[in-house]
């Protein structure tokens, strides 16, 4: 999982990527290709 300052590029990397907010942090999850997972500080 990458820690990024901006998730704009992360959510457009793959069409299955979704932006989700958990525990006050913002995550990008991708079920079909999990190496695109990312989180924002």
Swiss-Prot record:
GO biological process, alphabetically ordered: translation
A Pfam family it matches: Ribosomal_L36
Keyword Transit peptide among record annotations: no
GO cellular component, one term: ribosome
PROSITE patterns linked to this entry: RIBOSOMAL_L36 (PS00828)
Positions of transmembrane segments: none
Family to which the UniProt record says this protein belongs: Belongs to the bacterial ribosomal protein bL36 family.
Family annotation (HAMAP family): Ribosomal_bL36
Name of the molecule in the record: Large ribosomal subunit protein bL36
Taxonomic source organism: Xylella fastidiosa (strain M12)
């Amino acid at each position: 999982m990458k820690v990024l300052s901006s998730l704009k590029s992360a959510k457009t990397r793959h069409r299955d990527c979704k932006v989700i907010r958990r525990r006050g942090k913002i995550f990008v999850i991708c079920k079909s290709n999990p190496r695109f997972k990312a989180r924002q500080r």
